[in-house]
């Protein structure tokens, strides 16, 4: 059933942009919730063996999500996101940056644009990530961003399969 699900990851260095397209075998409402509800996000958004821990999240325009990716040894890497646009079950945009433990952003950051569409019971998510700095984007990719996104989206796929059965 999960065979032939679309996954595309493209890096455009000239535009300082990463384009990700991923298809999920789940309805749009469930996929939207998986990207917008902290209790679901924390179950998949960190690449294993890391876990995500949301300290606070206010999913509204101008709202923020502050969370950590926690290593098995307990080391925390904090991130802050600010929601800049929300069109329910269609699109949302945010600014993302690493942060210190007090939610102070460490710039430069990146602008993320998520678009959702559903066809025949499958949901396609298009993610466009514009980086303020080419060197930041190159460093993220060097640190394993491509592999990390692939692993986390696979974790989401597995989680959606479990949640769909409920």
Segment roles from a protein language model:
Residues 19, 39-76:
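Short beta-edge strand/loop motif at the mouth of beta-sheet-based domains
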